[in-house]
Regions:
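Bacterial N-terminal signal peptides
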Residues: 8-15
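Positively charged n-region of N-terminal signal peptides that target proteins for export
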Residues: 1-5
Length: 823
């Protein structure tokens, strides 16, 4: 196998970067560069957007796939996000939407008939194929092809391909890992075969004799005989192969590998990978580009690769097979998921649109017992709810095919938008003498890291009442009376009012919090179950397809010979991943909203004291205190106030106990939420609470620096000597401003909350009945928008209106000068 990681990545991508630097000399004269730069949008994760294109169309949630009809008369998009799912019919020539039909469930698969009179679409966990007739430029439902009974029966169709001459529709699935053959005339399943792995894309060879199936879970492309369905060959690829593209001559298939920054070219005669293209912006970059869609120009000389997590298209010259070279990059919207070329235009679907935003109407776990307080934020007093999972509507961009100069300008913009560089990977931002080193392996006076993960709160929900920070008191559900310890940590150590989680919900949140990355499987699947459309919660190590390529923080610690131990996180009574086996506390209760966090804290104290006694405290300690998730209004379970207060007291007692231990002077505690989905925030739906405590942490300090989940992880990595896990933590700003050179080892004193921790929900009301429908045994195995509303009303009153979420499409960039204030 010929690997072009060094040639195509190092020579190609670096050559592009150097060309962009040369162009910088004339940038002031470049009207396109100046115009696009002036519209730059900075996302909550620190990355930026300057999407190319003269026109765009608004779509629904998370467009996953885009297909063109045989003549190019139509384009179809399937929108498969958390809220509204639909099929959109588009005229790619006039660049207008012809029709948009809502679907109960849909997922990825689309196929036009040869005569363009019929469109087939995968019906998600309804386990059927939706059939539409196209007449007068409209989609008209024309029945279904049923594969089996709906969820909880596990089938879930994904990629489709059609052999019109044989009246056969081939369907890959991702829940029962199979390939189905359907008769399009009788609308019946006529054959099926087990694949053994979750499928993604399904394509027929040009002569219709063979099928190519990308085994999303199996790190391979399977070739099957189209008549017998017998396996002809399995061709090994990198992790998470997704989209595929066949050349017209039938000699090669390109496959994007979403969990590996790469696209592989398969020689179908040799049945092996003969070239690997690295799609990332720098040589040997860690995981984080997420290539997930492919397109060729009509003459097949240029290949476009949609890099979902780099927010760009990578462009390769592929005229000479085995001698491909990088030409540059094109900036897109947020999380591009599909790309096609038509009529000298590049069509791109942007899964999360063009920006993030605030959600003052966000979910509220604690709807008040008294009339809603009307504060300064007028949006907080309107009726609609803004749930983060459905806030980011997709878009489609139409980008005229760029010439060489325009592509150079686009490439420079992509590099400008991307905070990750190879230099940052090895030399982080910081200051000389600070306890946070700037290089991996440099010494730090801090020896022990304690990392606490909690559940789902925004900044305004908890600290909106703190006058020193940028808060909105009208959105504060859990003020100091309920969360005295978190308020004390913010006041005594560092108040962080510009901290953003990288995730939308717990499914991707636990991946971002444990690996600074959520791969394409996670990002494209959590929306289904969170939208109440079936699916399972398996995003905390349960399925290897959801694992980042290089594993989680414990895997990286193991490679770096850093000792570690986890308490209830990725270890619910047993190890969820191999790296945690033998490194978890069996007496620490896993996720269970019926078990108090203060009891978990006692179990940690007992285990910790024994480790201290034996001089065996690991350097990295991860803990889960998750009761601030709350149980909503379910009768017999703690009220939202009591659950959050329990969580707060556990945190306070933890810091107090550690601060009175012999290792406090060498310790630091980092605390964050896995996501911020369960509440409103007037700045952005991703803004959340975060805390840092320890001897080397500043006292009485307000830090307005923009930080992220990945930045907190980067800070821990620099202390412990662990290399970045992804491009995101490599790029993120470390939290060095929170630290001081001279330690202050004054211990912390926990505060008792101003409410009864044993207070239970007692009202058999409408919200109780709604809560009974929820599965609270796992994080967010529920409709979180509704759950957030229940929490809001339980706290603020059953008739109060929960503010909508603000999602940060975020801030239009000014060159930022970070502020830090001493109190």
């Amino acid at each position: 196998m010929r690997i072009y990681l060094s040639l195509c990545l190092f020579i190609g991508a670096v050559a592009v970067f150097l060309a962009c630097q040369r162009q910088a000399k004339t940038a002031t004269d470049d009207a396109l560069y100046q115009s696009m730069s002036s519209k730059r949008v900075k996302l909550p994760n620190g990355w930026s957007l300057t999407p190319a294109g003269e026109k765009s169309l608004n779509l629904n949630d998370l467009p996953l796939n885009l297909v063109l009809s045989p003549s190019g008369k139509y384009a179809a998009v399937t929108n498969n996000g958390q809220s509204i799912q639909s099929i959109t019919l588009i005229d790619p020539t006039t660049q207008t939407i012809l029709d948009d039909v809502k679907t109960p469930k849909s997922y990825y698969g689309l196929a036009f008939s040869a005569d363009e009179s019929t469109l087939y679409a995968s019906g998600g966990n309804d386990n059927k194929i939706l059939v539409y007739k196209i007449a007068d430029n409209k989609l008209k439902a024309d029945g279904d092809i049923v594969l089996g009974k709906p969820w909880p029966v596990k089938i879930s169709p994904v990629g489709l391909c059609l052999d019109d001459a044989q009246n056969k529709l081939f369907v890959g699935t991702k829940e029962n890992n199979s390939l189905y053959v359907c008769d399009t005339k009788t609308r019946k399943v006529i054959d099926s075969v087990a694949l053994g792995f979750k499928a993604y894309n399904c394509q027929l060879s040009n002569d219709k004799s063979q099928l190519f199936v990308s085994l999303w879970e199996g790190s391979a492309v399977r070739i099957l005989d189209a008549k017998t369905l017998k396996t002809v060959a399995d061709i090994a690829t990198s992790k998470n192969p997704n989209d595929m593209l066949q050349t017209r001559d039938g000699k090669y298939v390109y496959v994007a590998c979403g969990n590996d920054n790469s696209v592989m070219m398969i020689d179908l005669q040799k049945r092996q990978v003969v070239e690997t293209l690295s799609a990332s912006l720098y040589p040997d970059a860690p995981v984080g580009s997420t290539p997930n869609a492919l397109a060729l120009t009509p003459d097949e000389t240029k290949l476009f690769i949609a890099n979902a997590d780099n927010n760009c298209l990578a462009v390769f010259d592929v005229k000479q097979k085995g001698r491909s070279r990088s030409l540059g990059f094109i900036p897109t919207g947020w999380y591009p998921t599909a790309v096609k070329v038509w009529n000298n235009q590049i069509l791109v679907t942007n899964g999360k649109g063009f920006s993030s935003s605030a959600n003052p109407k966000g979910p509220n776990p604690n709807r008040s017992k008294s009339p809603q307080y009307k504060g300064a934020n007028p949006q907080a007093n309107r009726d609609e709810t803004q749930y983060i999972g459905g806030l980011f509507k997709g878009t489609m961009s139409f980008v005229p095919m760029p010439d060489e100069r325009t592509l150079a300008t686009y490439s420079r913009l992509v590099y400008d938008n991307t905070p990750y560089t190879k230099a940052k990977e090895t030399l982080a931002e910081g200051e000389a003498g600070n306890p946070i080193p700037m290089r991996i392996g440099d010494n730090s006076p801090i020896k022990y890291v304690f990392y606490i993960i909690k559940e789902n709160r925004t900044y305004d929900q908890v600290l909106g009442d703190v006058k020193e920070g940028n808060g909105d008191a009208s959105l504060c559900l859990f003020p100091e009376k309920i969360t005295p310890n978190q308020h004390a940590l913010a006041r005594e150590f560092v108040l962080l009012d510009n901290f953003y989680v990288d995730a939308e919900v717990s499914a991707d949140g636990h991946n971002w919090s444990a690996a600074a990355y959520a791969n394409d499987y996670v990002e494209k699947n959590w929306v289904t179950s969170y939208g109440g459309r079936g699916g399972t919660y398996d995003y905390e190590g349960q399925k290897t397809i959801a694992h980042p390529r290089d594993g989680f923080i414990w895997d990286h610690a193991k490679r770096a010979n850093v000792s570690y131990r986890t308490y209830g996180w990725f270890a619910d009574g047993k190890a969820n991943i191999p790296a945690v086996e033998g490194h978890y506390c069996q007496d620490f209760h896993g996720y269970d909203l019926g078990y108090m966090d203060v009891e978990r804290e006692k179990a940690w104290e007992k285990d910790f004291d024994e480790l201290v006694k034996n001089n065996a405290v690991p350097r990295l300690n991860t803990l889960r205190f998750g009761n601030d998730h709350t149980s909503g209004a379910r009768v017999g379970l703690p009220t939202p106030d009591a659950a959050v207060a329990d969580n707060d007291l556990a945190v306070g007692r933890f810091v107090e106990h550690l601060s009175k231990s012999p290792i406090w002077k060498e310790s630091v505690v980092f605390i964050l939420e896995d996501d911020a989905q369960n509440g409103p925030d007037h700045v952005d739906a991703h803004r959340s609470i975060a805390f840092v405590a320890g001897g080397y942490v500043k006292r009485g300090f307000v830090d307005h620096t923009m930080y992220s989940t990945s930045g907190m992880l980067r800070t821990m990595e620099l202390i412990l000597g662990i290399k970045p896990m992804s491009q995101y933590d490599a790029a993120a700003t470390p939290m060095w401003r929170c630290f001081q050179k001279t330690p202050d080892n004054k211990p912390f004193t926990a505060r008792e909350p101003g409410i009864n921790l044993n207070e239970k929900n007692v009202a058999y009301n409408y919200n109780h009945r709604r809560t009974l429908q929820f599965d609270l045994s796992q994080p967010d195995a529920i409709d979180d928008r509704i759950f957030s509303e229940i929490v809001w009303q339980t706290v603020r009153g059953e008739k109060s209106k929960m503010p909508a979420p603000v999602r940060g499409a975020f801030v239009k960039l000014k060159e930022e000068s970070e502020e830090e204030d001493d109190d």
